[in-house]
Each structure stands twice: as C-alpha cells, then as structure tokens.
C-alpha cells in the first residue's frame, strides 16, 4: 500500500498548488506533531482553502474537517507568528529531490516552510536567508551537516536535476551497468520521474523484463548472487521474474529504450503543466455473506496523477484533480481500516464454521470407513471359514501342548517353510491378547486376470477363543455399532452445525452492525465538553479544564445564553445555550446548577454548596486596569442569581440517534411544563426580593476587607467578580445546608468573610466569598454599607466626579462621617463602584477611564461576590485554540437535539447511541439510567457495570443491544465526575 509521495507526485502536486499563489494565510492549526493545516484565503474572495502538509508523507488541499488540537503546539505558534496574514508567493520543488519549498512574503519579510518528504521527513521554518528559525526534527547528517535552529538550510544538499539522456549517455549508462541488472534498476536513479513512470514507459514498449546480459560469463555467478543481499522480498521477486527475463539487445532494443526515455520526459512535462487528473487504484475484496451471494469491497492501495499501464487491470476511482484524489485517499483511510477489520473478522468467523463442518465430515467419513472394513472382514471370515477354523485349532493345539510362545513362533515358521496352507495364512501371532492375524482373500473373486496378478489380501484379527462364525458375528456387531454411532454423530453434527452457523451469523451481524455504527456515528461538537440536554430541551455544556472554560465562553456563549457557576473554587463554567432567546425555565437552571456543583471539587469532598447564574452580558474577559485574567478566568459584573442547594446526584444514561422520519414521533418529550415552573420559581428567584421589604438589620454579607493588615478600611457594596477556574487547587468555603434557617440567619450576620488571603509577589491570591441566599435584616446591612461607604469616601481628600479619583487616598478622619454621608447622598446616582474597587486593588493614584453609568447600577440584593487578584506578571501558559474561520453553532442546534431521544419506541430506526452523564432529575423519563453519587468506586468499573445493567434490561431490544455493544467503556466513563457510587434497582444480581 502506498503511504507517501514519490517524485512524480511531488511534480504534479507542486504544479497544481500554483493556483494558491497570492492567497493569504488566515490561520494555522496542528492535527498532530507531524501534520499541519494552513487555512488560506484569496484576496477579496469568500472561498477558503485548507492546505495540509505532513512531514515525510504528503501535502495537498483538503475539503474534509480534520481534528485539531485544543491548544496549538509550539511549532504552530511559531508558524502563526511569522506566517499569519502573509501571502503565499511561491511553491517549488527543490531541484529534483523530494523537498518542497513554500515561500510566504517577499524581500526581507519572506519566510520559507521547507517540507521534506523522504525518510523520517521534516518541516523547517526559515527566514529570507534560509536561516532556520524553527525545526520540527533537529538532527545531524554526517560530521558537517547540522539541522538545527540558527543554522542555514543547505540548499545544495538537494538532488539536482539530471541532464536529458541523449543516445551517447544512454549507451554509456548501459555499458557501465552490471550483468543481470534490470532496465528499471538502471534508469530509476538517472531519471527524475520516479519508479512508477519508468515502469509505465518500459511496459508500454515491451522492455519491462529486459536485463543486461554481457558476453563474459565470469561475472554471471556474481550477478546471480547479488539479489541474495537484498533480503527475502527481493529474492522472492527475483525468483518470480527469473523465467521471464529477456536479454537486452543493444542493436535492436536501444532505439526502443531511447523512445521510452523520451516518453518519460514528456510525462514529466505534462505533470508540470498542472492539469493532472487523480486516480485511486483499488483492489476488489470479496466479502462473505450469509445467503451465499457475492459482495465486494474496494480497498484503496495507491494514488497517482496518471493512469499507468501497470494498473490497467485494477479497479480505479477517477477524480478531476490529483489533490482531490490524495485528499480522498488519506481521508478515507480510517473507514478503510474499519472495513478491512470487519472483513477480517467475517472471514475468521466463516473459517471457524468451515473448520467445524470439515471436522464433522471427517468424523463421519471415518465411521463409514470403519463400517466398510468390519463388514469386509466379516465376509472374508465367512468365505474362508474352514481355513480360519483350522488356523484357530492349530494354534490352540500348540498352546494346549504347553509350548512356549517362542516355540510356537518357530513351529509356525517351519510350517510356512514347508508350504503349509494354514500356516502360510498366519500373518502374526498376538498371543498376549489371545489373537492371531490372518491374511485372507476372497476365494470367489477369481477372474481371468487373476493369473496375471496376486489376489487382494486383507489382514484380519481372529479371536482364538471363538470359532470362525463367532468371529464373523463379532465383526458384524462392530459394524452395526459403528452404524449406530454414525447415526448419533450425524444427529449431533447437525445440531452442532446449526449452532455454529447461528453463532457465525450472529457474529457476522454484530461485526457488520458495529462497523456500520462506527462509520455512521457522528461525533457532535459538544461531546468534547461536559454536556447534557435538560428536561426542557436546552443544551447545557461545561468545560473540563481552564482551557475549555475559556473556549466555551469565547466561542460558544451567545447573547441570551446563561452562564452558571458553582459558589466554589475549581468548578466548571457551565453554559445554557438559548437559541430561541426566551426566558430559561427554572428547572433547566436547577439542572445546570447541579451540573456545575458536581463537576467541581465538591464532588470528591462530598460537600453541598450553592450555584448561581448570570446572563451572558455579565461575563467578561475585561480585566481591571493593570491586571491580567489568566486562562479560564472571567469578570462577572452585577447581581448573581443564586439557585437553591441541590444534592450531588448525577445519572448515567443513553441517548439514541433517530432516523429523520422517526423524529416527529418524539417531539415534545422534553418540553417546558408550566406547573413545574410554578413550583420552582419561588425558590429560584428568592434573591429578587425588593429592597424596600428588607429590614434594617440585614447583614452586610458581601462586605470585603481589602486593606493592608494594619488598615481597618472596609469596602462594601457589590464589587465586580472574577471567577478563577482551577480544577487542581483551590480553597473551598461553603455554607452547610443542614443548619436550621432561623439559626442560620442569626449566624450569617456574624460569618462575614472579610478576611483576605495574603498574597506574595509570586503567588496568585483568590478570594471566594460564599454567602447565603436567604432574606436578611435590612437595618444592619444598611448600617454597615453606610459605614463602609463612608470610610471609602473618606479615603479621598476631595469629592470626585465620575471620571476622577483621589490623588492621595488616606484613612477616614474623625468628624468627617457626617459630611461624607451628605456627599454620598449627593452622588448616589453615580456608579463609581468599579472605579473604587480597582483603585483599592491597585493602590494606585492614577486616573481611571470613565465607567458606564445607569445601565450598570448594581442592585443591593443578596449576592456573593468573588474577586481574584492574579499575579503581577502572569502570562498564559496554554493559549486556547480558537478557530476563527470555523462556523460556530449559534446556540444548541434544535434539530440535532430533537433527533436524540432517551425514550426509544418500538419500531424506531435507531442509528447509534451516545452515552450521557446528566443531573439525575433530567433523566427521569429515560429508558436506561443509573444513579451516580460520590463514592469510592472507579469510573471505568462503574461504566462497565452500567452497560451490563442496560444490556440485561428485559425491555432492551435486539437493536438497542447491538448499539450498546458499539459503545466503548472509556467513552461512557469520561464524563463521570470522579470516584463514584452506582445505584440501580436489583443491583446485586448484576455483580459477578
């Protein structure tokens, strides 16, 4: 099977890529450490083309969507830095070698990407002087040639084009060839066209098996021994072609060879024109079928830009361009592997069935043969009754005379020497078993030809204790016993064969089903995240780590979407996609909150905490002046809507992909139910109580002490919130839900998290404030707010306008509180809260930019605020990969969600099954489900047990069982939060 480009492929590929000259690099991605994608865009053109290069293997344009790494590699970042928005100026082959040079930009701003397509391959990024800026595989060749950064790329190392072979050069080449060399071996290193072209032109002119034969015979043994050094494969090839070798005639064959060389050069010129079609050479593989009909599967083996004559008897697929053929060849490699694996499994299953049939047939044949032999022996004893009786009596007489066994042997030999007929019929004495072997023939089988040939003799064992008739009867009994055994064997064989055939057909069915499911299985974009579909048909996604948290907020969160987060550090960022723009029902909010809590450190800690939701416009990556938001960190502005506490209960279930014609039967399975909304709304919106109903004694639970250890300055109100996502570390500050609400209201006024985690210069400080979501007394809160606000205002020497700030902040002086309260009343409509918070963080006296006014006034409702004070010189470690050119789904694709059901009906056409981990309340109506709670069990073991439970369900149909078999345990376990306890009805019977 062809795996990489040859010289002629490179010639045609470079010529075809000339159409991309002048296009700009839009973006660069890496598929793996050897394969890179260049997203190209023409000037003023809407169309985009993706150029794929793979070190040591290939380069071509592609229309397929290749998987890209979540974060770009270091090499990709280097390529982006130097090549992004650069114009592709030149694509050329270096000399006649398998090296391609892509030039981006011109003059001193030019950069080269050099792709090596031989040996282990390489990709080198150089500047305009070909000085290496970055190299994929640094190495050395010999003592002087070094491939590394800041080394100049050796252009002279590339193989230079050979001169056109004239008649004299061709004759000299043939004269210098060794005796026994094939013409293709001589021409390949001397023509810049590759072995496929040379084989084509030689076959076209009838010179494919011509070898050089010289008159001297001294070198013949050496020539014959030479292929032995090439290994087993070369020796086998030599043996196969040895009989077809033809000597090359320098007189008659030389003009033909010269014409063949010209044809090869014409093919190269045709390839340089860039008008090559593409061909994929295929092999027809016969597929075994259940009903005996013949089916075929076409396996791709090679790709070429020209239909060579050596492939005229092969199946082929034709394409308009060579790039299309290469793209199709490599893009279908995975499905071809699946088909070949399926074919191999089918063949193995049928081979086992064939072996069973052959074994049974062999056993029946042996039983039939035994019957024939026993019957024949019985007939021979009957036909030679007197002879058999005489032999038995003679031996019995010798035994009765008390002769020793050696004496009896000597007696028989003497009788045979004397020509005794009875003694001559004795073949062997088996006195240890009381038997003798007689040589018997049919006395009635006397034809005219008997005088010319000896009669057929059969050796028959005779029991000395029985007469001739009794021995004959014994053989007849043995024959009947064998016949009965044969009958039983036939009956058993039929049952065994039916069972084997049934198992084989079942195996074939399973193999084909799994193969079809794997090929039909569409991996949806949201499966790379934590995800589930809510009870009301909203798609909910969450990030697995900081990079994915960044990704879903930047790429997938749209206006009207809801951002959900747990009131705990290290939780996943959860997005509820809202394509309709309508208000998200409370039940979906609760389920998303449960997901956010479960995918956090709360799961392993087995603690219950709160979650909250905000709208998408409240989430921002805009950091305070002078600060940096690390990957996965966001600023949340305004009020947070807290959700009721929920249990750490998740569920594992299956969603089935429906065929389009069956989707309508399942519409409305996940719809909004108003009664449930009415029941849940009071709990969900308990934070939205009007402020005039709050008492004066409400606890200022959101107060934060941001002063130095020696300062008593307090800051109140509702500061902007930055959620720092760290899955590995983090301090958990939660409120216990087991406390009596009345007692808790009293305690919560005292449990105000006003401590600050001390921050060093090289350590990021995170402040997570977890507060209650219940009603508080207003007076206490207002008192504290006024006091804290007064102290903040006292830190200024003069009353600032909205866009100004104090130059010399100081502590509040005695006697200024009354004046500051008047100032506060005067400037109460100004939203300077964010400016004050930033000033306190930065300890800066510089001026800030004006803040937004009326649209960003923060309500004084209960909410918990978080603030992360990152490192002074923080920098992103792993930038998140954002594909700006990719089409981003706007909200959940409703059609896709409607095509997935957890409640398959009888008669539905199910295409494949997708495992889903979701809050258990979202799975109440699903057919297959198990409950997951924090425990000590491993995720893989729990997933395996869940599959076993689903497969053994009485209501599980045959198709559903087939789909279950195609699900891998790792895909089932990857979304389980952590150590887990699995719960299901009658769980004990599934444990082995």
Swiss-Prot record:
GO CC terms, sorted: cytoplasmic side of mitochondrial outer membrane; nucleus; RQC complex
Name of the gene: Clbn
Name by which UniProt lists this protein: Ribosome quality control complex subunit NEMF homolog
Domain comment, as recorded: The N-terminal domain contains a nuclear export signal. The C-terminal domain may interact with cargo proteins.
Family, per entry: Belongs to the NEMF family.
InterPro entries reported in the protein's UniProt record: NFACT-C, NFACT_RNA-bd, RQC_Subunit_NEMF
Major localisation: nucleus
Keywords attached to this entry: Coiled coil, Cytoplasm, Membrane, Mitochondrion, Mitochondrion outer membrane, Nucleus
Function: Key component of the ribosome quality control complex (RQC), a ribosome-associated complex that mediates the extraction of incompletely synthesized nascent chains from stalled ribosomes as well as their ubiquitin-mediated proteasomal degradation. Thereby, frees 60S subunit ribosomes from the stalled translation complex and prevents the accumulation of nascent polypeptide chains that are potentially toxic for the cell. Within the RQC complex, Clbn/NEMF specifically binds stalled 60S ribosomal subunits by recognizing an exposed, nascent chain-conjugated tRNA moiety.
Pfam families: NFACT-C, NFACT-R_1, NFACT_N
UniProt feature coiled coil, ranges: 331-370, 481-514, 774-839
Biased composition (Basic and acidic residues): 214-231, 782-796, 845-874
GO terms assigned for molecular function: ribosomal large subunit binding; tRNA binding
UniProt induction comment: Up-regulated in response to DNA-damage induced by ionizing radiation.
Basic residues bias locations: 814-825
Lineage: Eukaryota, Metazoa, Ecdysozoa, Arthropoda, Hexapoda
Result of knocking out the encoding gene: Mutant flies are viable and fertile. Shows small, developmental delays and shortened lifespans. Shows dysfunctional intestinal barrier with increased number of intestinal stem cells (ISC) and enteroblasts (EB). Results in enterocytes (EC) with fragmented mitochondria and defective depolarization. Results in aberrant activation of JAK-STAT signaling pathway. Shows hypersensitization to ionizing irradiation with melanotic masses, defective S phase checkpoint and decreased cell death by apoptosis. In neuroblasts, pros protein does not show relocalization to the nucleus.
UniProt-annotated stretches for the region Disordered: 214-245, 688-715, 771-895
Gene3D superfamilies per UniProt: ibrinogen binding protein from staphylococcus aureus domain
Membrane topology, from the record: Peripheral membrane protein
Biological processes annotated in GO: CAT tailing; positive regulation of intrinsic apoptotic signaling pathway in response to DNA damage; positive regulation of intrinsic apoptotic signaling pathway in response to DNA damage by p53 class mediator; protein export from nucleus; rescue of stalled ribosome; ribosome-associated ubiquitin-dependent protein catabolic process
Subcellular location: Nucleus; Cytoplasm; Mitochondrion outer membrane
Top-level division of the source organism's lineage: Eukaryota
Quaternary assembly: Component of the ribosome quality control complex (RQC), composed of at least the E3 ubiquitin ligase l(3)76BDr/LTN1 and Clbn/NEMF associated with the 60S ribosomal subunit. The complex probably also contains TCF25 as well as TER94/VCP and its ubiquitin-binding cofactors. Interacts (via its C-terminus) with pros (via its homeobox). Interacts (via its N-terminus) with emb.
PANTHER family: NUCLEAR EXPORT MEDIATOR FACTOR NEMF, RIBOSOME QUALITY CONTROL COMPLEX SUBUNIT NEMF
């Amino acid at each position: 099977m062809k795996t990489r480009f040859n010289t002629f492929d490179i010639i045609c590929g470079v010529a075809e890529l000339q159409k991309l000259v002048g296009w700009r690099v839009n973006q660069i991605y890496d598929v793996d450490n050897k394969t890179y994608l260049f997203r190209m865009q023409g000037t003023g053109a809407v169309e985009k083309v993706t150029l794929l290069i793979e070190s040591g293997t290939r380069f071509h344009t592609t229309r397929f969507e290749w998987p890209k790494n979540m974060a770009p590699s270091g090499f990709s970042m280097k390529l982006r830095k130097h090549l992004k928005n650069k114009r592709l100026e030149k694509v050329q082959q270096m000399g006649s070698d398998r090296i391609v040079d892509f030039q981006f930009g011109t003059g001193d701003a030019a950069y080269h990407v050099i792709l090596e397509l031989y040996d282990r391959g390489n990709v080198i990024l150089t500047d305009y002087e070909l000085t290496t800026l970055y190299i994929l595989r640094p190495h050395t060749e010999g003592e002087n040639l070094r491939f590394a950064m800041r080394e100049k790329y050796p252009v002279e190392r590339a193989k230079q084009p050979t001169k056109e072979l004239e008649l004299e050069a061709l004759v000299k080449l043939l004269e210098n060839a060794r005796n026994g060399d094939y013409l293709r071996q001589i021409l390949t290193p001397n023509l810049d066209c590759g072995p496929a072209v040379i084989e084509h032109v030689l076959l076209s002119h009838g010179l494919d098996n011509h070898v050089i034969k010289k008159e001297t015979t001294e070198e013949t043994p050496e020539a014959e021994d030479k292929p032995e050094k090439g290994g087993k494969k070369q020796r086998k090839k030599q043996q196969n072609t040895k009989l077809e070798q033809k000597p090359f005639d320098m007189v008659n064959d030389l003009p033909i060879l010269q014409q063949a060389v010209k044809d090869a050069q014409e093919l190269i010129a045709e390839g340089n024109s860039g008008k090559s079609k593409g061909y994929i050479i295929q092999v027809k593989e016969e597929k075994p079928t259940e009903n005996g009909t013949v089916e075929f599967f076409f396996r791709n083996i090679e790709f070429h830009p020209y239909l060579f004559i050596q492939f005229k008897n092969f199946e082929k697929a034709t394409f308009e361009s060579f790039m299309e053929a290469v793209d199709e060849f490599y893009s279908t490699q995975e499905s071809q592997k699946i088909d070949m694996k399926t074919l191999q499994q089918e063949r193995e299953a049928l081979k086992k069935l064939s072996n069973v049939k052959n074994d049974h047939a062999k056993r029946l044949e042996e039983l039939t043969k035994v019957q024939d032999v026993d019957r024949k022996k019985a007939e021979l004893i009957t036909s030679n009754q007197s002879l058999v009786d005489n032999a038995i009596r003679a031996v019995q007489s010798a035994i009765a005379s008390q002769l020793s066994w050696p004496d009896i042997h000597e007696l028989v030999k003497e009788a045979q020497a004397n020509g005794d007929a009875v003694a001559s019929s004795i073949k062997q004495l088996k006195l240890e078993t009381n038997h003798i072997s007689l040589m018997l023939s049919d006395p009635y089988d006397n034809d005219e030809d008997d005088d010319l040939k000896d009669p057929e003799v059969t050796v028959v064992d005779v029991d000395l204790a029985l007469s001739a008739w009794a021995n004959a009867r014994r053989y007849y009994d043995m024959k009947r016993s064998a016949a009965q055994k044969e009958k039983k064997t036939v009956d058993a064989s039929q049952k065994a064969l039916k069972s084997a055939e049934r198992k084989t057909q079942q195996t074939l069915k399973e193999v084909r089903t799994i193969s079809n499911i794997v090929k039909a299985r569409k991996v949806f974009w949201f499966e790379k995240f934590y995800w589930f579909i809510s009870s009301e048909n909203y798609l909910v996604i969450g990030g697995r780590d900081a990079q994915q948290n960044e990704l879903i907020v930047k790429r997938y969160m749209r206006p009207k979407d809801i951002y959900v987060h747990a009131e705990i550090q290290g939780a996943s960022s959860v997005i509820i996609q809202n394509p309709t723009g309508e208000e998200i029902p409370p039940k979906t909010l609760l389920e998303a909150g449960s997901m956010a809590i479960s995918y956090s450190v709360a799961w392993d800690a087995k603690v219950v905490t709160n979650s909250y939701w905000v709208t998408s416009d409240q989430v921002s990556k805009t950091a305070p002046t002078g600060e940096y938001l690390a990957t996965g960190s966001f600023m949340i502005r305004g009020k947070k809507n807290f959700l009721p506490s929920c249990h750490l209960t998740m569920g594992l279930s299956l969603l089935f992909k429906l065929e389009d014609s069956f989707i309508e039967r399942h519409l409305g399975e996940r719809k909004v139910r108003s009664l449930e909304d009415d029941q849940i709304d009071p709990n969900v919106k308990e934070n939205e109580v009007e402020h005039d109903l709050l008492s004066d004694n409400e606890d200022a639970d959101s107060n934060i002490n941001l002063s130095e250890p020696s300062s008593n300055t307090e800051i109140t109100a509702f500061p902007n919130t930055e959620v720092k996502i760290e899955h590995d570390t983090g301090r958990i500050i939660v409120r216990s839900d087991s406390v009596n609400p009345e007692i808790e209201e009293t305690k919560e006024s005292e449990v105000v998290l006003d401590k600050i985690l001390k921050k060093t210069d090289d350590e990021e400080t995170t402040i997570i404030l977890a507060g209650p979501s219940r009603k508080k007394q207003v007076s206490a809160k207002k008192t504290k707010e006024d006091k804290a606000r007064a102290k903040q205002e006292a830190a200024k020497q003069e009353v600032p306008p909205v866009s100004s700030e104090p130059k010399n902040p100081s502590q509040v002086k005695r006697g200024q509180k009354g004046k500051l309260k008047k100032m506060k009343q005067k400037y109460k409509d100004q939203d300077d809260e964010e400016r004050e918070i930033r000033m306190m963080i930065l300890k800066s006296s510089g001026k800030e930019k004006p803040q937004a006014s009326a649209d960003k006034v923060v309500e004084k409702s209960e909410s918990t605020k978080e603030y992360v004070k990152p490192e002074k010189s923080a920098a992103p470690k792993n930038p998140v990969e954002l594909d700006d050119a990719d089409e981003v789904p706007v909200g959940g694709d409703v059609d896709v969600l409607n095509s997935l059901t957890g409640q398959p009906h009888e008669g539905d056409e199910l295409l494949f099954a997708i495992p889903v981990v979701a809050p258990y309340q979202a799975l109440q109506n699903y057919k297959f489900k198990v409950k997951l709670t924090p425990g000590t069990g491993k995720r893989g073991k729990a997933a395996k047990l869940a599959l076993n439970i689903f497969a053994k369900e009485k209501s599980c149909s045959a198709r559903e069982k087939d789909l279950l078999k195609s699900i891998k345990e790792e895909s089932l376990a990857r979304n389980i939060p952590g150590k887990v306890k699995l719960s299901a009805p009658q769980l004990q019977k599934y444990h082995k």
